[in-house]
């Protein structure tokens, strides 16, 4: 068959999309077309910050039906989402409790309990995953301690992409790359860790053994009656984004830039040394036995909140105004946990500047300048940490995802990091999702083969570092700004 049509459902923490890919195996051309885009946002339900998963499912089905109604024969479907969040089901497959978001404050104070009762080094030795207060391990502990009446009703716990695949197919699956984000998967066995799971109060029977990307979960029956296979892709959106990152060689790092920024490198081995633990490095699972050695950075969430609070709709105009301002007048640590979900983001940023005896950003452009400069400096700091960890410097950084469209931030990143930045592709998570589907359909051999297709079909923009820039001169001075309460233990 010359042409393949695959559908990627890509859900981020702020938006979702259903994308149609058309692959010409003869000419190795790959095109994407957006079928349906929709908003994903938090809502308050019974005092909890929750996801409207019924609305998300409705939009997923709407997007799939739109493709089918065009008369296109879909070869496969794949779903990727953000990590750590889950849905509980009873024996009949009905939901138990609420789909609570990782940004909810129910996990406050939970992680320190684990550090005392299990031990930080022991948790890291078992999982190899960074300590973030909203990891699934702490969410489940919060659930079983705060709402014990729910646990007796639970028969299954599905992570978000597995839940939506279940809703389409009726079949349950626990995909490996996303499962590793829970901090509950043993890094040596690739299965759920008995000790860590027992501490949460959840039952191991709620989970099936994690499966690696590339298996067919089941079929979705389209309105026309055709059975379409739903493939378990690398269902953590960052895992999919990394698959589509055209990394040139082992000296290339990546930055998946969106609501979250995830910076790291690809490795055939995990890094679980004392040095890695001290730096709060994570070893998330990838496809083909690869590890995503990375760190989470709060990312454009700060900007998204400021845009919403101040009703800013013209982002290009804001960026143009921001670029005209002098650099590094206002600096914060974007990974300070005060920025996870404050009532008022711009007020929180202003307070952080005030508390460190800096000028206070007031205008929209000043707030954006603060965010962009601070992110770029944090990127440089973390890239240095990652290079020290592996014992080799990086020569190139690939920025993928929606954030790679921000030319100002890309240049600031290049200047601060002191290396060449390659920006693109924008829809990296979608492309990585499609890549696994094409491999499952035997159209491509492996990830390296797929990256060649991406490189041939998607243009990248190059940013050359300017060592004389203002932000480059501030790199060494940024360290004191990081002495804050970070997203770690």
Swiss-Prot record:
> Could you say which EC number(s) this protein's record lists?
2.7.1.5
Q: Name one GO molecular function term.
A: glycerol kinase activity
Which co-factors does it depend on?
Mg(2+)
- Which superkingdom does the taxonomy of this entry point to? Bacteria
Recorded GO cellular component terms are: cytosol
**InterPro entries recorded for this chain?**
ATPase_NBD, FGGY_C, FGGY_N, Rhamnulokinase
- Oxidoreductase: present as a keyword of the record? no
Q: Which residues bind ATP?
A: 13-17, 259, 304, 402
Pathway where this protein functions = Carbohydrate degradation; L-rhamnose degradation; glycerone phosphate from L-rhamnose: step 2/3
Q: What class of enzyme is it?
A: transferase
Reactions the enzyme catalyzes = L-rhamnulose + ATP = L-rhamnulose 1-phosphate + ADP + H(+)
Disulfide pairs? 68-222, 353-370, 413-417
Q: Which residues form the active site?
A: 237
Q: Does the keyword Magnesium apply?
A: yes
The record lists substrate as bound by: 83, 236-238, 296
HAMAP family per the UniProt record, alphabetical = Rhamnulokinase
General function of this protein: Involved in the catabolism of L-rhamnose (6-deoxy-L-mannose). Catalyzes the transfer of the gamma-phosphate group from ATP to the 1-hydroxyl group of L-rhamnulose to yield L-rhamnulose 1-phosphate.
Q: What family does the Swiss-Prot or TrEMBL record give for this protein?
A: Belongs to the rhamnulokinase family.
What's the name of the protein? Answer: Rhamnulokinase
Organism from which the protein derives: Salmonella paratyphi A (strain AKU_12601)
Chain's gene name: rhaB
């Amino acid at each position: 068959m010359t042409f393949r049509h695959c559908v990627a459902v890509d859900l981020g923490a702020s938006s979702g999309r259903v994308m149609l890919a058309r692959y010409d195996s003869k000419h190795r051309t790959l095109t994407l077309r957006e079928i349906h885009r929709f908003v994903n946002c938090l809502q308050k339900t019974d005092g909890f910050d929750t996801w409207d998963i019924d609305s998300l499912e409705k939009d997923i089905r709407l997007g799939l039906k739109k493709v089918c109604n065009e008369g296109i024969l879909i070869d496969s479907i794949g779903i990727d989402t953000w990590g750590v969040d889950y849905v509980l089901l009873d024996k009949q497959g009905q939901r138990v409790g609420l789909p609570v978001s990782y940004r909810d404050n129910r996990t406050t104070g939970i992680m320190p309990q684990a550090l005392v009762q299990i031990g930080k080094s022991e948790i890291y030795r078992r999982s190899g995953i960074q300590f973030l207060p909203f990891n699934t391990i702490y969410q489940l502990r919060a659930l079983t301690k705060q709402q014990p009446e729910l646990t007796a009703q639970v028969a299954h716990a599905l992570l978000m992409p597995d839940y939506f695949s279940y809703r389409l197919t009726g079949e349950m699956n626990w995909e490996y790359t996303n499962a590793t984000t829970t901090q509950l998967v043993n890094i040596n066995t690739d299965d759920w860790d008995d000790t860590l799971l027992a501490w949460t109060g959840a039952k191991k029977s709620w989970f099936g053994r994690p499966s690696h990307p590339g298996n067919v979960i089941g079929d979705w029956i389209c309105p026309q009656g055709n059975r379409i296979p739903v493939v378990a892709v690398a269902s953590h959106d960052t895992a999919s984004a990394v698959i589509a990152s055209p990394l040139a060689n082992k000296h290339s790092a990546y930055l998946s830039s969106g609501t979250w920024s995830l910076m790291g490198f690809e490795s055939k081995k995990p890094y679980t040394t004392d040095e890695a633990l001290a730096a709060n490095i994570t070893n998330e699972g990838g496809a083909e036995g690869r590890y995503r050695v990375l760190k989470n950075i709060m990312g454009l969430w700060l900007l998204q909140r400021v845009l919403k609070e101040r009703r800013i709709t013209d982002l290009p105009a804001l960026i143009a105004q921001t670029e005209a301002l002098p650099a590094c007048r206002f600096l914060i640590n974007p990974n300070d946990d005060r920025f996870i979900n404050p009532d008022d983001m711009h007020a929180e940023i202003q307070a952080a500047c005030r508390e460190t005896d800096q000028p206070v950003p007031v205008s929209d452009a000043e707030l954006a300048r603060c965010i962009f400069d601070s992110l770029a400096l944090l990127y440089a700091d973390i890239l240095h940490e990652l290079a020290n960890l592996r014992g080799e410097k990086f020569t190139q950084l690939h920025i993928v995802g929606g954030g790679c469209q921000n030319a100002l931030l890309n240049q600031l990143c290049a200047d601060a990091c002191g290396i060449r930045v390659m920006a693109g592709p924008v829809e990296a998570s979608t492309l990585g999702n499609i890549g696994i589907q094409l491999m499952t359909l035997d159209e491509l051999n492996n990830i390296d083969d797929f990256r060649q297709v991406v490189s041939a079909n998607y243009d990248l923009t190059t940013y050359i570092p300017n060592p004389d820039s203002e932000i480059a001169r501030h790199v060494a001075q940024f360290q004191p700004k990081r002495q804050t309460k970070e997203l770690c233990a």
